[in-house]
Amino acid sequence: MLIEAVRLTLFPAMMAFAASSDLLTMTIANRVSLILIAGFAALALLSGLGGAEVLSHVEAAAVVLGVAFFCFACGWIGGGDAKLAAVTALWLGFGNLFSYLVYASLLGGALTLLIVQFRTIPLPRLLAGREWAERLHSQGAGVPYGVALAAAALLVYPQTEWMTAVGL
């Protein structure tokens, strides 16, 4: 019963936290990745995931981390985004990775277009004085891509072995 509760809540809760943190502060704390790594390890152990399957998930994370680190080095994404994408790949594995990357790309593109459009209009009075809104509205600021990464993860997560094992 505890395992099912962890399967149902840990990953989605951490994705929601990462998205809101990135939106409000443009940072994703290292503890998000560390909690998700520890959660994956514990859940894999308690669920009886085989060594080959665990290794496959780790390989998926390593591939994504390598590509994401390159993107970070080029200045295209933030370090928190790179770590979030990699730890998400750890949980999703290769079987769900393609869907995740497609969703992340589409949602990231849509988010970027919305933010670019948002920056062309005056900041609504309701948002004036709110640091996160002013940062988001600033022409020189980046895009909180963690929002798209987390949303994509939440779209794919119901198809993972973690959720199908719960039987919902």
Where are these regions (language model features)?
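A membrane-topology feature that recognizes alpha-helical transmembrane segments
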Residues: 1-168
